[in-house]
Amino acid sequence: MKKIALCYDFDGTLCSGYMQNQELIPNCNLDVKKFWTSVTENSKKNNIDPTLSYMHLLEEKMYKAKVEISKQNFNKYGQRLKLFSGVNDWFKRIKDFGKKNNIEVEHYIISSGLTDMI
């Protein structure tokens, strides 16, 4: 049996936009657009990677808003993520298709997002 791997980005591929925009950022009493603008500004001002900038600012904002920073809390947000239509059964359908064609299909999600939400 042949083996293939399918790799996906999460944000914008499996769900619309950034996963944090759906509930996490709004639950910190933040405007999503303003948050990402501040991430860009912080990144340029401090000459740091935008991903590190967003992680730092999100942690800071969550702490200030008293939003729990824990694996369990991120899991709760992840369970409520709204995925694109068809994503929920996509992985099983492709695995089944692979089996019928003597192919083992493995799925991998590659993301710089919060993996505990995925």
Range-by-range predicted roles:
Residues 1-118:
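Alpha-helical substrate-recognition element adjacent to the catalytic core
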